[in-house]
């Protein structure tokens, strides 16, 4: 493809993306892809093309094969999982990132990549109201960030002996403590870090689905009394099921007393902390050792962009650094080499989409969208609370409303089947998308508000769809 051909194709694709977003906003597509497993695979050639193809053929397949197999996360009626927004400014930042072909092996391989990431992560720190004691780096996802945090916790608890001799070299097993509502990625991170399920403690939650600090204290003390070593506590700030907020201040106090690392998983809720009125929800976060939040969810940078912050970057670098001779530079003592801040050696220029987004939206623009979604969630909460045959099963802390339709006098198992059916009927209709989930043994329906284009009319629409599906 020549530069001129690229220019023509690029203009065409920018128009295509802009048109797609307009069509999504007009609700031209069913929110959930209407396809069956294997349908796209069967429609595509089983072998790669041997000769170059015209760009028009690629465009045709994009329209006729790829797009029909997409679930439309940008649709204003998408209320499943959590938001995965990619604002236009971030899309353009991603385009420039790929177009520049930068590779962040070390500072020298791309000074712009390294230093823009430093600046953007410090901007986010300020937007979150965090102190200057925090230093940040972009990871691909919160799963990776949590894994890095638990490896750092393991090395601090073992005085770096685990790196030399492995966990089997430890006389006392190292224990990790998580909420029973913690994301599955926390368990996976602990397993990959070598802890094993026998060395994980699932701490019970209260009526609001937040970790019970007293139960954590009891578990820490019991393990210590039996010769085990508390290593890490993972507090959840905005759980996946209900956006429950663990009491970070009390958890931090317990972790500090036990000598355990405290990692805060704020993958979703962290975005909300750019509005000051949300910050009481993570009171005590300054006492944590590390925290993560995902701008690629609610804020709109697009995947993959996970902001990981630590209070002791020297410890992080000691744990993660290998520093072979071929990666050293003449400026080694003057610069940050982000390869030593995580797993990846080769790093994409992710900060560009952050930079584009913050410039194009401004802090006030991003805050306004968060506040809009919070207001929509409170509106839906009020509707559910006023309906005699519906109940909320969790507090509405942020933008997620968890509901359940009631069938008085019916067997609980039948009510579970009924609520699962409601979610399935809404999703199959194409008029909205919600997530069925199980909370403490009961089937419920999650309505997660936060797509960029979602306005009050779309929240009213999903509420009407839920009521209609309940009557079906």
Can you name each region flagged by the protein language model?
Residues 141, 145-317:
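Conserved PLP-enzyme active-site core in the AAT-like
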């Amino acid at each position: 493809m020549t530069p001129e051909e690229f220019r023509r194709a690029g203009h065409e694709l920018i128009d295509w993306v802009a048109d797609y977003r307009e069509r999504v906003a007009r609700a031209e597509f069913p929110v959930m892809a209407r396809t069956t497993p294997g349908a796209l695979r069967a429609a595509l050639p089983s072998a790669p093309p041997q000769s170059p193809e015209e760009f028009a053929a690629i465009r045709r397949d994009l329209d006729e094969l790829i797009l029909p197999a997409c679930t439309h996360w940008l649709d204003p009626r998408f209320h499943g999982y959590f938001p995965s927004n990619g604002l236009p400014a971030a899309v353009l930042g991603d385009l420039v990132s790929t177009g520049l072909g930068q590779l962040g092996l070390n500072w020298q391989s791309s000074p712009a990549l390294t230093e823009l990431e430093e600046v953007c992560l410090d901007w986010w720190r300020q937007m979150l109201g965090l102190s200057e004691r925090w230093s940040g780096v972009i990871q691909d996802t919160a799963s990776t960030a949590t894994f890095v945090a638990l490896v750092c916790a393991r090395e601090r608890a073992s005085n770096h002996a685990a790196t030399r001799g492995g966990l089997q070299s430890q006389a006392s097993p190292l224990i990790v403590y998580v909420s029973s509502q913690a994301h599955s990625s926390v368990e996976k991170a602990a397993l990959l870090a070598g802890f094993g399920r026998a060395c994980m403690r699932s701490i019970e939650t209260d009526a609001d689905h937040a970790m019970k600090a007293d139960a954590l204290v009891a578990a820490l003390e019991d393990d210590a009394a039996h010769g085990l070593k508390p290593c890490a506590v993972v507090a959840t700030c905005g759980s996946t099921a209900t956006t429950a907020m663990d009491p970070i201040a009390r958890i931090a106090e317990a972790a500090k007393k036990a000598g355990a690392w405290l990692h805060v998983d704020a993958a979703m809720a962290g975005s909300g902390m750019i509005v000051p009125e949300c910050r009481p929800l993570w009171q005590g976060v300054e006492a944590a050792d590390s925290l993560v939040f995902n701008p690629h969810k609610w804020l709109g940078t697009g995947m993959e962009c996970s902001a990981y912050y630590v209070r002791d970057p020297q410890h992080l670098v000691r744990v993660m650094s290998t520093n072979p001779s071929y990666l050293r530079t003449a400026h080694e003592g003057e610069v940050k080499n982000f390869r030593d801040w995580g797993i990846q050696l080769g790093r994409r220029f992710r900060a560009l989409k952050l930079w584009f987004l913050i410039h194009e939206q401004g802090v006030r623009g991003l805050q306004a969208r968060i506040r809009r979604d919070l207001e929509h969630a409170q509106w839906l909460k009020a509707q559910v609370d006023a309906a005699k045959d519906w109940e909320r099963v969790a507090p509405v802390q942020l933008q997620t409303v968890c509901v359940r339709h009631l069938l008085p006098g019916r067997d609980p198992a039948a009510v579970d089947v009924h609520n699962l059916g409601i979610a399935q009927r809404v999703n199959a209709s194409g008029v909205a998308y919600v997530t069925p989930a199980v909370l403490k043994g009961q089937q419920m329906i999650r309505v997660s508000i936060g797509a960029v284009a979602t306005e009050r009319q779309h929240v009213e629409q999903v509420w009407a769809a839920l009521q209609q599906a309940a009557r079906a």
